């Protein structure tokens, strides 16, 4: 079992409230209990190992995917509901309770973020943290302090193992 709750060194400081570290099992429970979760993936998800795990998470939990950056081509031909959106626009839209969502069924209550550059996603989640009730679960390789919950800083192998544990727990 990978301990994803350690090594939470802050590389930047955006505020006084930082995310709580989480385990793959707890993250899986929160994802399963979410009413309207959205898997938000970044360009780093084009790593074949990470892409495979993102697809498995979306399929197993029946979660739509918001493909940001240049990640959309990775989901073409996969059996997932993926739509492209600019990450900064998504961060703006999810703070609006009247936003219809990517599917027209309303806004999302939980964002699961994976495959982003840490300083970029931290800025986007700063807005959602401070201006909405949306929860953000960072299952990234790096600790994301503006998420509601986050894995700690992990090696690549530990990150893959943690994602496998999360998939098994969904």
From Swiss-Prot:
Pfam families the record matches: CO_dh
InterPro entries reported in the protein's UniProt record: CdhB, DHS-like_NAD/FAD-binding_dom
UniProt GO BP: methanogenesis, from acetate
Gene3D superfamilies documented for this protein: TPP-binding domain
SUPFAM superfamilies linked to this entry: DHS-like NAD/FAD-binding domain
Top-level taxon: Archaea
Pathway(s) where this gene product acts: One-carbon metabolism; methanogenesis from acetate
Keyword annotations from UniProtKB, A to Z: Methanogenesis
Functional description taken from the UniProt entry: Part of a complex that catalyzes the reversible cleavage of acetyl-CoA, allowing growth on acetate as sole source of carbon and energy. The alpha-epsilon subcomponent functions as a carbon monoxide dehydrogenase. The precise role of the epsilon subunit is unclear; it may have a stabilizing role within the alpha(2)epsilon(2) component and/or be involved in electron transfer to FAD during a potential FAD-mediated CO oxidation.
Family in the record: Belongs to the CdhB family.
Quaternary data: Heterotetramer of two alpha and two epsilon subunits. The ACDS complex is made up of alpha, epsilon, beta, gamma and delta subunits with a probable stoichiometry of (alpha(2)epsilon(2))(4)-beta(8)-(gamma(1)delta(1))(8).
Protein name: Acetyl-CoA decarbonylase/synthase complex subunit epsilon 2
Organism: Methanosarcina acetivorans (strain ATCC 35395 / DSM 2834 / JCM 12185 / C2A)
């Amino acid at each position: 079992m990978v301990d994803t709750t350690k090594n939470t060194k802050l590389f930047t400081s955006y505020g006084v409230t930082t995310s709580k570290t989480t385990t793959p099992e707890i993250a899986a429970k929160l994802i399963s209990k979410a009413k309207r979760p959205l898997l938000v993936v970044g360009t780093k998800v084009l790593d074949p190992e990470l892409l495979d795990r993102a697809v498995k998470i979306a399929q197993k939990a029946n979660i739509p995917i918001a493909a940001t950056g240049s990640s959309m081509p990775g989901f073409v031909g996969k059996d997932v509901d993926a739509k492209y959106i600019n990450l900064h626009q998504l961060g703006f839209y999810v703070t609006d309770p009247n936003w219809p969502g990517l599917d027209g069924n309303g806004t999302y209550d939980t964002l699961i973020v994976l495959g982003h550059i840490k300083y970029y996603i931290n800025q986007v989640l700063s807005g959602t943290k401070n201006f909405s009730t949306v929860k953000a679960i960072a299952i990234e390789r790096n600790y994301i302090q503006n998420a509601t919950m986050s894995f700690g800083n992990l090696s690549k192998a530990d990150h893959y193992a943690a994602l496998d544990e999360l998939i098994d727990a969904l």
